[in-house]
From Swiss-Prot:
Xref: InterPro entries: Glycosyl_transferase_4
Its job: Involved in the biosynthesis of the disaccharide D-N-acetylglucosamine-L-rhamnose which plays an important role in the mycobacterial cell wall as a linker connecting arabinogalactan and peptidoglycan via a phosphodiester linkage. Catalyzes the transfer of the N-acetylglucosamine-1-phosphate (GlcNAc-1P) moiety from UDP-GlcNAc onto the carrier lipid decaprenyl phosphate (C50-P), yielding GlcNAc-pyrophosphoryl-decaprenyl (GlcNAc-PP-C50).
Transmembrane segments annotated in the record for this chain: 33-53, 79-99, 105-125, 148-168, 175-195, 198-218, 225-245, 260-280, 295-315, 347-367, 372-392
Protein name: Decaprenyl-phosphate N-acetylglucosaminephosphotransferase
Enzyme class: transferase
Site feature location: Important in orienting the substrate: 126-127
Topology within the bilayer: Multi-pass membrane protein
Reaction catalysed by this enzyme: trans,octa-cis-decaprenyl phosphate + UDP-N-acetyl-alpha-D-glucosamine = N-acetyl-alpha-D-glucosaminyl-1-diphospho-trans,octa-cis-decaprenol + UMP
The keyword Lipid metabolism appears for this protein: no
Molecular function, one GO term: phosphotransferase activity, for other substituted phosphate groups
Length: 398
């Protein structure tokens, strides 16, 4: 009963918080955020069809390879349509009465446009002509450096171990951490982009989680304009992914390509970085570990599935006496397909796993972490059961 009362209290607090947010529209402009996200979705949706025609004319087409899941040639370059949606939505945000204040006090959103143009351009070249890994990596470093140069960087880091608490990063540490995390997230999304709708869906889910977390930050910091950038960046990315997804879900009419997957990764990195920087311990207290760690946990949510897949792949290939980076058809999504899941079900299962971590981290700003943990545990059990159902059916058949 005590747990039920606590959960009811949390829900009441959340509901009253939402009402307060609508009442304080000047501090937390939910309607403007929704309009910006909708704009990104609409522009991306209609631009994707045009980009598909352009990709076919330029012969930027993904032909099926032995390790691929798709069986028909499919145009790439979807990232161009996504960037156009982002560009239009950010421009709209800069013209709206409340959100425009975020452009005055922060360069986060312009930084995303410039860095996004760099990484989308690199991706488009790769989608059409192909680039070696080193050149692509150099492009990723360049785009991440643009973010840092324009002021998007981790400035503080909360370490809950050994009584360290919050540490203020010096310039060198800030640059190195931001570059490392940005490039890691970019490659994580790129790595996981192996099934129709997977990268776009993961981008949508994680961006929504960051947006919810950012709205909570705005509430707790009395509408501080320093928290406008993560809210705008994440809602724009969510809208762009949502607009692209109808074209990309199984069976995909177009792939986002490296231009899209790297753009998604870059924007997720920028959103989590801008959310982490100005968090005040005065709003949460040093004991509220989960609220202070949530920006970093959101990064973990983005990288959880692809990094687990990458580590398992490296171990598997080394044990087999092959190069750690040699391609194969034993990735997590390949294995889920092999045990009997359909293409769509595999994508939905991975959505669930990432969503549990992402929304679990974001919800700590609204709910008691203990209650959040209990709900997450239940979700993990249910999703785990759904994941292994085909194996259980096989055993029953034997």
């Amino acid at each position: 009963m005590q747990y039920v009362r606590e959960m009811s209290s949390d829900l009441a607090t959340f509901a009253s918080g939402l009402l307060a947010l609508f009442e304080r529209s000047a501090g937390v402009p939910l309607r403007e955020l929704a309009l910006v996200g909708l704009t990104a979705a609409i522009i991306t949706y209609f631009a994707t069809g045009l980009v598909g025609v352009l990709a076919n004319r330029l012969e930027a087409v993904a032909y099926p390879r032995e390790r691929d899941v798709h069986v028909t040639p499919t145009p790439r370059m979807g990232g161009l349509a996504m960037y156009l949606g982002v560009l239009a939505a950010v421009f709209l945000a800069s013209q709206l009465p409340a959100l425009t204040r975020g452009f005055v006090y922060s360069s986060g959103m312009p930084a995303v446009l410039v860095a996004g143009a760099v990484i989308t351009g690199i991706g488009l070249i790769d989608d059409r002509w192909g680039l070696d890994a080193l050149t692509k990596f150099a492009g990723q470093i360049t785009a991440a450096s643009v973010l840092v140069t324009m002021g998007v960087a981790w400035s503080v880091l909360y370490i809950p171990l050994g009584g360290v608490g919050t540490i203020v990063l010096d310039q060198t540490s800030s640059i190195l951490l931001t570059l490392a995390l940005t490039v890691s997230i970019v490659n994580a999304i790129n790595f996981v982009d192996g099934l129709d709708g997977l990268a776009a869906g993961l981008g949508l889910i994680t961006a929504m989680a960051i947006c919810i977390f950012s709205v909570g930050l705005l509430r707790d910091h009395d509408g501080d304009v320093l928290f406008y950038p993560p809210a705008v960046i994440s809602v724009v990315l969510a809208g762009s992914c949502l607009g692209f997804l109808p074209h990309n879900f199984h069976r995909a009419k177009i792939f986002m390509g490296d231009s899209g997957s790297m753009l998604v990764g870059l924007m997720l990195a920028a959103a989590s970085t801008t959310a982490a920087g100005p968090i005040s311990q005065n709003a949460y207290g040093t004991r509220d570990v989960f609220a202070l760690l949530s920006p970093f946990l959101l990064v973990v949510a983005v990288m959880f599935v692809p990094m687990l897949d990458l580590l398992l792949a490296i171990v598997r290939r080394i044990r087999a006496g092959r190069s750690a980076f040699s391609p194969d058809k034993m990735h997590l999504h390949h294995r889920l397909l092999q045990i009997g899941h359909s293409h769509r079900r595999v994508v939905l299962l991975i959505y669930l796993w990432v969503g549990i971590v992402a929304f679990g981290a974001a919800s700590t700003i609204f709910f008691n972490p203990r209650n959040t943990g209990a709900v997450m545990l239940g979700a993990i059990v249910i999703t785990g059961m759904a994941t292994v159902i085909p194996l259980l059916r096989r055993r029953d058949n034997y």
